[in-house]
A protein has these predicted regions:
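Short internal beta-strands
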Residues: 70-79
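Active-site-proximal loop->helix
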Residues: 82-93
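Histidine-anchored nucleotide/phosphate-binding helix
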Residues: 54-67
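Conserved small/polar residues in nucleotide/adenosyl-binding loops
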Residues: 117-120
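Phosphate-coordination loops involved in phosphoryl transfer and adenosine-cofactor binding
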Residues: 43-45
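Short, well-ordered alpha-helical microsegments
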Residues: 55-58, 82-83, 107
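Positively charged, low-complexity intrinsically disordered leader regions
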Residues: 2-36, 41
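A gly/proline- and charged-residue-enriched helix-loop-helix capping module
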Residues: 96-108
Length: 120
């Protein structure tokens, strides 16, 4: 297992606040989370998410985890990656490999890394 790649772990609190705001304001996703918690449709599964990493998509990753999945996350665009949200996901126990402004070679490495987490 690879260590998380997080540019600013000290910003996790700010990221958690953003994700909590999203949670409060997305009732449909909250309902899905509730159902996933009960039904555990992804128990024992590994899910990789490669997406614009910001508060709404971070909440989606957490919803997937609430369904029992082991979730690994990377950003799909270094310019849309929000570092405090990345730090929050790591703090919440997800495997995260992303940072704002990453170079193309880094992005490739992050995408390979999230793929490797599912091969072991």
């Amino acid at each position: 297992m690879h260590e998380n790649i997080v540019a600013a772990p000290e910003l996790a609190g700010e990221g958690l606040q953003k994700i909590e705001w999203v949670r409060r304001n997305m009732p449909i996703l909250r309902k899905i989370q509730y159902e996933f918690e009960k039904e555990q449709p992804f128990a024992g599964k590994r899910i990789t998410v490669c997406i614009h990493l910001e508060a709404k998509t971070a909440f989606l990753a957490l919803v997937l985890r609430s369904g029992g999945a082991q979730v690994s996350v990377t950003g799909s665009n270094p310019e849309s990656t929000i570092d405090d949200v990345v730090a929050a996901l790591a703090e919440e126990g997800l495997r995260v490999y992303a940072r704002h402004g990453a170079e193309p070679s880094e992005m490739r490495k992050y995408m390979e890394t999230v793929s490797y987490t599912h091969l072991t």
